[in-house]
Amino acid sequence: MAYFDNAATTYPKPEIVYQSMDQFQRHTGGSFGRGNYGFSSSAKSIVDDTRAALQQLLHCPAKQVIFEPSATISLNIIIQGIIEKGARNIYISPFEHNAVTRTLHHYETMGLGKVVELTVNKDLCYDIQRIRFQFDNTKPDLVIVSHASNVIGLVAPVEEIFTLAKEFHSLTLLDMAQTAGLVDCDIGKDIFDFAVFAGHKTLLGPTGI
């Protein structure tokens, strides 16, 4: 079979992924951090090792790595929390996933936020000067950028955009679902407040993390 949907989910996985999942379910599957017995301790070691590996890969503090069932859930938790805390001027890229746009549309229809797309030129490249003009006119509370589009493949100049956003004291959220482990990005820098990615795409892992 020829498989061409890797931008949605990579397949097949490396053999070690299948073996590790089988090993975990048969011999580890305890509740992480909720018991003082062998299975629970083994699960904690796996989680701690995974955090350390992600720290090496993405240059982020291991203790700031949080696991959720999906990138969609992670994005929703972050966006809802920030809006509930009072953020109203939300800027997004023109290439956001439905996990972002539908959540923001929900709040916008409730009168709890205004959503504006960051400016791109006719070649679909970000226009930093025009984005600065946008921020000058309406100060951002939250700037959300998809690191790469899984439709057209455009990689956003995220450091430029987020550095500009920080001049206006905005929170920043990077959707790395398409790029984690594939495109180098130092999310340990102060310009990154939140970064979300999935295990089942470019990290070649299973779904559900």
Which role fits each region the language model picked out?
Residues 1-209:
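Pyridoxal 5′-phosphate
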